Amino acid sequence: MSSPYNRGSRHLQDRFDTRRLADRLDEKFLANPVIGAEDRAFIERMEMFFLATADAEGRPQCSYKGGDPGFVRVLDERTVAFPNYDGNGMYLSMGNLLENPHVGMLIIDFTSARPSRLRLCGVASIAESDSLLAAYPEAQFVVRVRATQVFPNCPRYIHRMDLVERSPFVPRADHETPVPDWKQASWAHDVLPARDQGRER
């Protein structure tokens, strides 16, 4: 397997004397990208993550993805899946996946007594007819990510936070999802998709 480190990484590792440490971390965590039992439990209790993507020219996007706990599902030791819910219609991150499927997922637990985080990198695919779609009310499609790297990340700079309230905008079964304020703005009402025309808060 090729090294996960590029020339830039190696340059800085040598500059700050961390090459040996980086090689050990590669051997211990990166060489075998398996989602273990602890990783699975961590992923499936989280209600948010950050998604990094880039287009065909390498221009990046980073987006926040939120849902109820368990909205990211571990399908097997190398695959996770999550829904794409209604957004602002720009499809910056999801559009990138159609041009460049390589993604990074940063999953952080801010609220536990000992905050922690997990990185999962992989290759993503989009399916509008995915068998999981029925499990996600109002989801437009399902994204599956085949992991190429799975590893815990140093938690020391994570600020501990409290969850005050889960978003009422997360689609849920037997619950009418409210309309966000911005869809009621005068600049937006005549360009909303047909499914949103006439809806009120």
What are the functions of these language-model segments?
Residues 1-201:
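Binding-site signature for planar aromatic cofactors or substrates
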